[in-house]
């Protein structure tokens, strides 16, 4: 047993989609979350800068004595997850492999779409993982750089959001039966994405799939929080506006949360 919290990092609020799933599947675990909204989105940034920013988030979580770190950010996973995983002596999980595996299990036609930030798509990491696991799969990748700013500005339900999603996804419509939401911000746009793609296209939430791996590793390393420890103290940190973070989180998480501003 290990009552230390699980650390989550993201470029902003998108990783809350992963935290929500953790709270649903593993409600006894405690969360510490850091979202770097002040420097979001990470996707258009150079790899070197993404690496620097991500290490700052990792080091922040380490000061909080976490027992595991979850990269709730596809861009950071694509750029620096392997490096961090090799250097730390606690488990470090990313969202890309779980999402890739789920897409392969879901598809019937073998036609899979990937949407993500420019850096995630440029890295080809989803395509590589999918083809490593199942070489016969046909993968279509599409960068959607306008999606993260919509979410970070809390305009998910606006007419502008609907227009941008429709225009962005049109190259994939009618060509795939499975679509990986390759950015943890994107599930916040899920209803619009589903409407554009149609009811027959299965949407894969890579962050939600990651939580299943968290559960496996907690069991494997005997890191589960004691079920007799009833008091949970979830802590959330943002590098930008606390009010904006709370507003988005209130629509997404099943409880009121404590949020603090932090400067990295």
Swiss-Prot record:
Enzyme class, one word? Answer: isomerase
Lineage top rank: taxon: Bacteria
Which SUPFAM superfamilies would you find in this protein's record?
Aspartate/glutamate racemase
Query: Coiled-coil segments, which residues?
Result: none
Q: Where does substrate bind?
A: 10-11, 42-43, 74-75, 184-185
Q: Name one GO biological process term.
A: regulation of cell shape
Q: Which HAMAP family match?
A: Glu_racemase
The Swiss-Prot or TrEMBL record describes its family as follows: Belongs to the aspartate/glutamate racemases family.
Function per UniProt:
Provides the (R)-glutamate required for cell wall biosynthesis.
The protein's name: Glutamate racemase
**What is the taxonomic lineage of the source species?**
Bacteria, Bacillati, Bacillota, Bacilli, Lactobacillales
């Amino acid at each position: 047993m290990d009552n230390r919290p699980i650390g989550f990092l993201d470029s902003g609020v998108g990783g809350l989609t992963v935290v929500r799933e953790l709270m649903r599947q593993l409600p006894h675990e405690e969360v510490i979350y850091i979202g770097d909204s002040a420097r979001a989105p990470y996707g258009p940034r150079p790899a070197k800068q993404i690496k620097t920013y991500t290490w700052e988030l990792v080091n922040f979580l380490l000061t909080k004595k976490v027992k595991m770190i979850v990269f709730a950010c596809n861009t950071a996973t694509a750029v620096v997850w392997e490096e961090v995983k090799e250097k730390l002596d606690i488990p470090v999980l990313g969202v890309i492999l779980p999402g890739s595996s789920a897409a392969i299990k879901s598809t019937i036609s073998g036609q899979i779409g990937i949407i993500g930030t420019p850096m995630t798509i440029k890295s080809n990491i989803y395509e590589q993982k999918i083809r490593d696991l199942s070489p016969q799969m046909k993968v279509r990748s599409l960068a959607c750089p306008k999606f993260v700013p919509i979410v970070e500005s809390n305009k998910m339900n606006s007419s502008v959001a609907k227009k941008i999603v429709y225009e962005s996804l049109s190259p994939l419509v009618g060509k795939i039966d499975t679509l990986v939401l390759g950015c943890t911000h994107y599930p916040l746009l899920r209803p619009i994405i589903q409407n554009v793609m149609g009811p027959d296209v299965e949407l894969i939430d890579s962050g939600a799939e990651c939580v299943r791996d968290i559960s496996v590793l907690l069991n494997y390393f005997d890191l589960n929080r004691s079920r007799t420890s009833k008091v949970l103290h979830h802590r959330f940190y943002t590098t930008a506006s606390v009010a904006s973070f709370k507003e988005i989180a209130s629509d997404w998480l099943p409880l009121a949360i404590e949020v603090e501003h932090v400067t990295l």
